[in-house]
């Protein structure tokens, strides 16, 4: 049965000044709040060719000491037009008093990552502690991610991957721009 959209009693905030106020432990990452869109490129030795993609990433919070994280990507053709969905993941970044970030990230392809890292000087570096795979998921052994605010409205992303018997190596990079509030999906 379909229910019409309704206002949540405690909606997430996408901006530092919105209510609820960010938890004090989120101070190193409040600049990430919002929706980011842009393009990037990727490749991996097991793929037929390198590729271009568009990406949308959203960070929000509900006043507790973690960020909600959602990312979607679409493969692009040579003219920059979307071909098909290529990746999707969701999760949480848990901020700790010592500046550590514990990230829980899941993908509908059957991959769940637990990563640990640090938030410093506008950058968040994460490396996997554990990867759990559904029985039919492709083998992934490790990932390393770096998110960097190069200015208040630009977020860069680099993703290294160890999968299907290959060592940890470059997989993805993107440059995203902050979306103005009220734009987008």
UniProtKB/Swiss-Prot annotation:
Annotated heme b binding sites: 171
Keyword Ribosomal protein recorded: no
Name of the top EC class for this enzyme: isomerase
Keyword Iron: yes
EC number: 5.99.-.-
Sequence motif GXWXGXG, residues: 34-40
Listed pathway(s): Nitrogen metabolism
Protein name per its UniProtKB record: Peroxynitrite isomerase
Organism name: Streptomyces griseus subsp. griseus (strain JCM 4626 / CBS 651.72 / NBRC 13350 / KCC S-0626 / ISP 5235)
Upper taxonomic lineage: Bacteria, Bacillati, Actinomycetota, Actinomycetes, Kitasatosporales
């Amino acid at each position: 049965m379909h229910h019409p959209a309704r206002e949540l009693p405690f909606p997430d905030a996408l901006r530092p000044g919105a209510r609820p106020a960010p938890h004090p432990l989120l101070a190193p990452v409040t600049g990430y709040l919002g929706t980011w869109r842009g393009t990037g490129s990727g490749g991996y030795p097991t793929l037929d060719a390198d590729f271009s993609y568009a990406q949308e990433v959203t960070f929000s919070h509900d006043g507790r000491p973690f960020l909600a994280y959602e990312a979607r990507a679409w493969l692009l053709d040579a003219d920059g037009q979307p071909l098909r969905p290529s990746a999707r993941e969701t999760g949480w970044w848990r901020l700790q008093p010592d500046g550590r970030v514990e990230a829980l990230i899941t993908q509908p392809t059957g991959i769940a990552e637990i990563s640990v890292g640090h938030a410093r000087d506008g950058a968040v570096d994460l490396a996997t502690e554990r990867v759990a795979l559904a029985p039919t998921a492709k083998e992934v052994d490790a990932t390393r991610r770096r998110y960097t605010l190069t200015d208040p409205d630009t977020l860069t992303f680099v993703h290294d991957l160890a999968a299907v018997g290959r060592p940890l190596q470059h997989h993805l990079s993107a440059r995203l721009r902050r979306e103005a509030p009220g734009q987008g999906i």
